């Protein structure tokens, strides 16, 4: 079978012939795994939307109907719900690899990637509201109410988002429409991400530009991607059929129908938002917390500016590598603090220390370590 195509399929040739560094590892597989996750989420989401009812009196029962009465509906629901967790696991590994190996040197590719991450978080949040359980309702109420921290116009924006004076049927309809639309926006951004990647090509673990030591993407790296696909599909099968895993990542409160008159014992988002939620809670001021929440994501956009080292990869930089693993540990600590009871010690103190280190790493340590790295590089070059 001839691999190279003509006409509308001509872009496939760019994938087949893409010059790829020969020394990239399995950490570079997560990009293709994310494409597979996005495809599975869109497919299962479209099938679920055929049976879902975006009405406050029917939403919860329609989800129960999907699980109980629709053929293989329970697989669709749990693959879609837990697939979001797998999606974010792959995203965080992909971002971590980019930070470790200096992928932000491809500035436009990095910016589009951060935008994809932001849209992903928005899509996941509004999707969490759709089952209309207790945590869905109160999570939507608390998180959307944060917009009221904007001076002067915050209250009006919140009412515009809600479509009224509280989270109601209008809110659910809007969130369902956006949750159906945004994945296709993500597809467009992913295509833009790939197009920008093809301009300069992928980076490599050494963090240096090498135009000679490259191989075509097919067949050397498609085989590695296929192996990753098989492993990921195996995980999807397990989370779809194993009862003890299906609901492991689901909040028990969300199996209770939403009741505006009963507040849950704790209100928290899904685990992949907990690090940002902990940063939000660590700032006593409401507006400051909201700004810190958005800054925790948008600070990634500054990485191409903050890191001015000549060799971006941390492979041969033991000091920067040491602090990188500190920020990884800090991410897990923030995730843990986000799930802890609000306003209780020592969680408040730990959360504030972890928040300071989170921003300190990006805004202080990264520029400082880059400057020191350049000094050592120039010193070794002159001796």
Curated annotation (Swiss-Prot):
Binding site for heme b b562: 80, 179
InterPro entries, sorted: Cyt_b/b6_C (IPR005798), Cyt_b/b6_C_sf (IPR036150), Cyt_b/b6_N (IPR005797), Cytb/b6-like_sf (IPR027387), Cytochrome_b (IPR030689), Cytochrome_b_C_euk/bac (IPR048260), Cytochrome_b_N_euk/bac (IPR048259), Di-haem_cyt_TM (IPR016174)
Ranges that cross the membrane: 30-50, 74-96, 109-129, 175-195, 221-241, 289-309, 320-340, 345-365
Gene Ontology CC: membrane; mitochondrial inner membrane; respiratory chain complex III
Pfam families: Cytochrom_B_C (PF00032), Cytochrome_B (PF00033)
Keywords: Electron transport, Heme, Iron, Membrane, Metal-binding, Mitochondrion, Mitochondrion inner membrane, Respiratory chain, Transmembrane, Transmembrane helix, Transport, Ubiquinone
PROSITE patterns: CYTB_CTER, CYTB_NTER
Membrane topology field: Multi-pass membrane protein
Positions contributing to heme b b566 binding: 94, 193
SUPFAM superfamilies reported for this sequence: a domain/subunit of cytochrome bc1 complex (Ubiquinol-cytochrome c reductase), Transmembrane di-heme cytochromes
GO BP terms: mitochondrial electron transport, ubiquinol to cytochrome c
Cofactor: how bound: Binds 2 heme b groups non-covalently.
Binding site for a ubiquinone: 198
Cellular localization per UniProt: Mitochondrion inner membrane
A GO MF label: metal ion binding
Cofactor: heme b
Assembly notes: The main subunits of complex b-c1 are: cytochrome b, cytochrome c1 and the Rieske protein.
Protein role: Component of the ubiquinol-cytochrome c reductase complex (complex III or cytochrome b-c1 complex) that is part of the mitochondrial respiratory chain. The b-c1 complex mediates electron transfer from ubiquinol to cytochrome c. Contributes to the generation of a proton gradient across the mitochondrial membrane that is then used for ATP synthesis.
Family membership: Belongs to the cytochrome b family.
Name of the featured protein: Cytochrome b
Recorded name of the encoding gene: mt:Cyt-b
């Amino acid at each position: 079978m001839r691999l190279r195509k003509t006409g509308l399929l001509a872009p496939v040739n760019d994938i087949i012939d893409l010059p790829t560094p020969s020394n990239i590892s399995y950490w570079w597989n997560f990009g293709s795994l994310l494409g597979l996750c996005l495809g599975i989420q869109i497919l299962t989401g479209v099938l679920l939307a055929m049976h879902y009812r975006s009405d406050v009196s029917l939403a919860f029962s329609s989800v129960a109907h999907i699980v109980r009465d629709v053929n293989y509906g329970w697989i669709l629901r749990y693959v879609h719900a837990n697939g979001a967790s797998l999606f974010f696991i792959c995203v965080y590994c992909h971002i971590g690899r980019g930070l470790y190996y200096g992928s932000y040197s491809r500035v436009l590719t990095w910016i589009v990637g951060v935008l994809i991450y932001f849209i992903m978080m928005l899509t996941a949040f509004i999707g969490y509201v759709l089952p209309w359980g207790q945590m869905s309702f109160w999570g939507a109420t608390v998180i959307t109410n944060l917009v009221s921290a904007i001076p002067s116009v915050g209250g009006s924006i919140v009412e515009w988002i809600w479509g009224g004076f509280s989270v109601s049927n209008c809110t659910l309809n809007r969130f369902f429409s956006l949750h159906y639309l945004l994945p296709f926006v993500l597809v467009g951004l992913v295509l833009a991400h790939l197009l920008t990647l093809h301009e300069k090509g992928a980076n490599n673990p050494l963090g240096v530009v090498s135009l000679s030591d490259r191989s075509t993407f097919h067949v050397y790296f498609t085989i590695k991607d296929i192996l990753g696909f098989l492993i990921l599909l195996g995980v999807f099968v397990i989370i779809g059929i194993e009862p003890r895993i299906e609901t492991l990542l689901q909040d028990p409160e969300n199996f209770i129908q939403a009741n505006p008159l009963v507040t849950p014992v704790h209100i928290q988002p899904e685990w992949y938002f907990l690090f940002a939620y902990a940063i939000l809670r660590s700032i006593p001021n409401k507006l400051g917390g909201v700004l810190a929440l958005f800054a925790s994501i948008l600070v990634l956009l500054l990485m191409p500016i903050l890191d001015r080292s000549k060799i971006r990869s941390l492979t041969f930089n033991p000091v920067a590598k040491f602090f990188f693993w500190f920020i990884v540990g800090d991410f897990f600590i923030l995730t843990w603090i986000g799930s802890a009871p609000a306003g209780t010690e020592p969680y408040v103190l730990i959360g504030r220390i972890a928040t300071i280190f989170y921003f300190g790493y990006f805004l202080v340590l990264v520029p400082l370590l880059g400057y020191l790295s350049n000094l050592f590089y120039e010193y070794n070059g002159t001796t």
